[in-house]
Amino acid sequence: MGDYGPFGFDPDEFDRVIREGSEGLRDAFERIGRFLSSSGAGTGWSAIFEDLSRRSRPAPETAGEAGDGVWAIYTVDADGGARVEQVYATELDALRANKDNTDPKRKVRFLPYGIAVSVLDDPVDEAQ
């Protein structure tokens, strides 16, 4: 048995196969639509495939959506400022390290690469 169960499939491989398969089908429909519309077969087919070819491509993933970043265990002091205590590569590692936490000011959060630690600061109350 491998790291990914009895069949040796990585969970990310399923996502990749589905994504590549859908892109391949979209490309095939676009080619068929161009062929039928250029050969003069009629406007019926070109109207069907024209809608498929107009579909916009998805925007590229951000660092947070792609999972590029770290999991941070941090505390918030009385002034609302955050101080990072530990950093982990995976959520599971961070949660395991924080499982016996009793301090309500100690938290776990994902930080994408390029984001300042100051985003962890507590918001300042204007009422005070």
Curated annotation (Swiss-Prot):
Protein's name in the database: Uncharacterized protein MT0327
